[in-house]
């Protein structure tokens, strides 16, 4: 068994393209579309674990727990640097390592998020040290920690770096106040800005390789980065970036786990073995909902007002004051409502009711100016982190509130996708406040003054009343589950299931209230008992129990042997010499085949078996050439454009199409009307595998294929697809990209007879049908393709893989010019004769060595500090 990983499944990390240590020197993903460059592996903690745990199975088993342990240790170091006692540090570390947001992301396949938290804690610790001694050395180490955070979290690391900058400035401004001196705000701010500059420089150098590869693969040439100023383009960009905004009511998930459910598939088959029943735990909120659905719901309300009769587009247009054409489009959206994403849940936001209770305690005590529990600096720090938590929550609301609009136009924020990411620093701040809260409890328990006794009595009474009210409220809500069920049913769930989900939400609310009451009881015992340590330990165990119970639904497992050792004849056939032809699914409705293809085969089996597909699993930011190519070959409502589907497959070496047996005639008639080059090879059916574990309610892993002449599905072979490599004696030079796309899409153009070259070379002088010779692929690897060619005349070798400036080519061992052909493909010019050609993916690695040097320098500085501190303590 391995831990479930949605974003890094075994199939993906087992593919040839991602093998270590090669990805440190460039990552070319060859299994989707025509291939494309992905961010190279960064020399950080996460990839170091990947290098250490070379075997994919071992990696999935151990990477997540190791990352969470690193987070806990880093948080402990941060709290110790704050000057908190060991028990406070331990509870703070537990709150960090068991935090639901961190754990849920790690169990979703993103344990690197926990490392971003860890490096931020480390950066904060060294910033605190810089305020006391050796400021420039400690700030440099803090900067390297920030750089590691950028490596681990990309835009999450960048977001945390902004908070770190604010923390540095705040720390330097309040530092002089410790001694009671009147601070010079300008001078203190200047030192803070200088500190930010040092941290930024060190972070930039440490993460230079990551920044370089991200700019080259995710931002430069990205179609989502187009700066169109039309209102429609701005609205589309806003919707794209804010789709994953936190609905305001769902902020309750921060203090009540499971109030809106957990995963979309809760309970899964593995949940039946857990101690607590998760029946009804399916997520029913609106996180990630497609913005189009808001418009659809508005139209549905208007249509409902007409009563039972059918509404004509003209009537809808009149009511909404729009054109008939727009009304027709809106009604079409309503009819296809099910195609849009209703909701998605891949993470939990529960901080822990005990953690939240302690954080609130710290803030309330800090706001009490008469209390002496915290020093002036500690009080200011608590209020700083309280402001960070509140501001981050408000920004996480994104499109659901006005706050994010104030910063949306600023650099970085106008490209950062998903405002829910602001919940990361909110959780971080609450964890810090939790540590302060525990420390405050212990300090108050040790005070033996009249004022402290009065404060303890008031606090215990107040906390007990609040906890009792919350418990009573939760019982009332639980008893009114029918009302909640009606609301859930309105979100698109059957009433019977909605009742179960409402019961689950009520149960979660009651359990959370009980944990709150227990935490109040333990806090009271800490305050009223001289021997507080046992009850502080009890509080630590309560944090573990609360967060462990809440995290259980996120912890899922895969039986990788059962999943990937599936004897599937179709997969076996496609995995033989996969570079000879790409695979896709029929664009026509294919029922269960389409679902099996999209969810199980494309995302898992194809990757595991290195099968190349023209389809893409996920590409939130599509490259500009990719987007332009796909847009030009998209079928429109005009039936005369059907041939574009066949032309797209022809140009992209898409040789295998999975579809219904009835699709063959349609393909030859519509997609290839002049040549009818689609043929059926093997018919097959989909059924249970012999060793199916869930025969009564099968999941995708339980299914396989069986070749059968009477099967409803077939593997269609497209004889017209261009080979992966081909020699051309006749080519046309065209440096205008739009003109190139028009030529390629023209029905009169024959891709087998003529090549379009988009580089500045001499036009061909050969006749159109002159023989050019032969070419063979002798070895095909993701980052190196070896070929032999026997050119009978001057020719261009076309390799039907995606062009990138980071690909190089040699002919007979000598460097040659890499040509861009057919808009997006690679090519090289050959003289007559026999040749050995090698294409290699070799992006620059200068920044990798800069990052490594910076990290080694950081270790050197850290060693210097450790040695000097030990020497100082010895003296």
List where the protein language model places each region.
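Membrane-interface coil-to-helix junctions
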Residues: 1-72, 94-106, 110-117, 121, ...
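Helix-to-loop transition at the C-terminal end of transmembrane segments
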Residues: 1-14, 208-223, 477-486, 554-557
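Transmembrane-helix signature of membrane-embedded glycosylation machinery that interfaces
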Residues: 75-84, 124-127, 131, 363, ...
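Transmembrane-helix signature of polytopic, membrane-embedded enzymes
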Residues: 76-98, 134
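Contiguous transmembrane helix-bundle modules in multi-pass membrane proteins
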Residues: 109-119, 126, 130-144, 155-157, ...
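Polar, glycine-rich mid-to-C-terminal structural blocks
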Residues: 189-247, 258
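Extracytoplasmic/lumenal acceptor-recognition loop(s) of multi-pass membrane glycoenzymes
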Residues: 245-250, 259-293, 484-489, 539-565, ...
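Active-site-proximal, structured, solvent-exposed surfaces of multi-pass membrane proteins
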Residues: 357, 722, 747-875
């Amino acid at each position: 068994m391995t831990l479930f990983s949605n974003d890094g499944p075994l199939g993906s990390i087992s593919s040839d393209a991602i093998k270590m240590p090669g990805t440190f020197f460039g990552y070319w993903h060859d299994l989707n579309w025509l291939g494309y460059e992905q961010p190279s592996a960064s020399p950080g903690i996460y990839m170091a674990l990947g290098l250490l745990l070379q075997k994919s199975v071992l990696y999935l088993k151990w990477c997540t727990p190791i990352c969470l342990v690193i987070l806990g240790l880093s948080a402990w170091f941060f709290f110790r640097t704050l000057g908190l006692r060991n028990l406070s540090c331990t509870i703070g570390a537990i709150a960090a390592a068991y935090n639901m947001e961190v754990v849920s992301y790690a169990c979703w396949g993103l344990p690197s998020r926990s490392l971003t938290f860890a490096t931020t804690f480390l950066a904060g610790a060294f910033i605190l040290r810089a305020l006391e001694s050796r400021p420039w050395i400690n700030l440099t180490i803090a900067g390297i920690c920030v750089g590691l955070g950028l490596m681990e979290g990309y835009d999450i690391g960048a977001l945390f770096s902004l908070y770190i900058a604010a923390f540095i400035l705040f720390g330097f401004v309040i530092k002089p106040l410790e001694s009671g001196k009147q601070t010079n705000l300008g001078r203190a701010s200047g030192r803070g800005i200088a500190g930010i500059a040092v941290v930024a420089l060190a972070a930039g150098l440490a993460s230079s390789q990551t920044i370089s590869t991200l700019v080259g693969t995710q931002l430069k040439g990205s179609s989502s980065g187009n700066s169109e100023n039309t209102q429609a383009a701005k609205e589309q960009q806003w919707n794209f970036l804010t789709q994953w905004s936190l609905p305001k009511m769902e902020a309750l998930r921060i203090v009540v786990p499971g109030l809106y459910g957990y995963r979309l598939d809760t309970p899964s088959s593995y949940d039946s073995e857990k101690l607590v029943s998760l029946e009804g735990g399916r997520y029913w909120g609106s996180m990630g909902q497609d913005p189009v659905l808001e418009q659809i719901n508005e139209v549905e309300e208007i249509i409902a007002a007409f009563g039972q009769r059918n509404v004509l587009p003209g009537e809808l247009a009149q009511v909404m004051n729009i054109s008939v054409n727009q009304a027709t489009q809106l009604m079409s959206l309503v009819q296809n409502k099910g195609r849009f994403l209703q909701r998605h849940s891949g993470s939990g936001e529960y901080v822990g009711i005990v953690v939240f209770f302690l954080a609130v305690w710290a803030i309330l005590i800090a706001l009490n100016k008469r209390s002496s529990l915290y020093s002036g600096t500690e009080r200011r720090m608590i209020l700083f982190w309280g402001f960070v938590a509140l501001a981050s929550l408000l920004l996480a609301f994104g499109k659901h509130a006005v706050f994010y609009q104030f910063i949306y136009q600023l650099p970085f924020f106008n490209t950062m996708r998903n405002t829910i990411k602001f919940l990361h620093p909110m959780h971080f701040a609450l964890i810090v406040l939790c540590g302060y809260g525990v420390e405050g409890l212990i300090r108050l328990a040790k005070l033996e003054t009249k004022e402290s006794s009065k404060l303890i009595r008031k606090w215990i009474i107040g906390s007990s009343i609040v906890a009792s009210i919350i418990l009573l409220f939760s019982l009332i809500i639980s008893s009114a589950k029918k009302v909640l069920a009606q609301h859930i049913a309105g979100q698109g769930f059957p009433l019977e299931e909605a009742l179960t989900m409402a019961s689950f939400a009520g149960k979660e609310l009651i359990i959370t209230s009980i944990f709150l009451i227990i935490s109040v009881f333990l806090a009271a015992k800490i305050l009223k008992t001289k021997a507080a340590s046992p009850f502080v330990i009890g509080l630590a165990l309560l944090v573990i129990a609360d967060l462990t119970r809440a995290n259980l639904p996120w912890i899922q497992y895969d039986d990788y042997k059962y999943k990937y050792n599936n004897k599937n004849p179709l997969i076996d056939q496609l995995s033989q010499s996969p570079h000879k032809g790409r695979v896709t699914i029929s664009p026509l409705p294919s029922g269960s085949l389409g679902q099996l293809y999209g969810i199980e085969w494309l995302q898992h089996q194809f990757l595991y078996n290195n099968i190349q597909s023209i389809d893409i699993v996920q590409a939130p930011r599509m490259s500009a050439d990719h987007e332009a190519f796909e847009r030009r070959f998209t079928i429109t409502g005009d039936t005369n454009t059907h041939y574009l589907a066949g032309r797209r497959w022809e140009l992209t070496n898409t040789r295998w199409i999975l579809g219904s047996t009835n699709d063959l005639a349609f393909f030859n008639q519509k997609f290839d009307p002049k040549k009818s080059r689609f043929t059926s090879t093997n018919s097959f059916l989909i059924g249970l595998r012999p060793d199916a574990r869930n025969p009564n309610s099968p999941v995708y892993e339980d299914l396989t294929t069986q070749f059968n002449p009477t099967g409803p599905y077939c593997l269609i072979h497209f004889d017209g697809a261009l080979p992966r490599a081909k020699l051309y004696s006749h080519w046309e030079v065209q440096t205008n990209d739009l003109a190139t796309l028009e030529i390629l899409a023209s029905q009169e153009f024959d891709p087998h007879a003529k090549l379009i070259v988009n580089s500045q070379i001499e036009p061909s002088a050969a006749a159109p049908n002159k023989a050019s010779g032969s070419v063979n692929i002798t070895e095909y690897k993701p980052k190196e393709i070896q070929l032999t060619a026997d050119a009978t005349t001057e020719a261009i070798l076309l390799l039907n893989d995606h062009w990138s400036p980071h690909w190089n080519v040699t002919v007979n061992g000598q460097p040659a010019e890499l040509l861009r052909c057919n808009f997006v493909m690679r090519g090289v010019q050959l003289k007559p004769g026999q040749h050995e050609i090698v294409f290699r993916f070799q992006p620059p690695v200068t920044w990798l060595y800069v990052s490594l040097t910076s990290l080694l320098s950081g270790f050197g500085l850290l060693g210097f500090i450790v040695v000097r501190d030990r020497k100082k303590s010895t003296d």
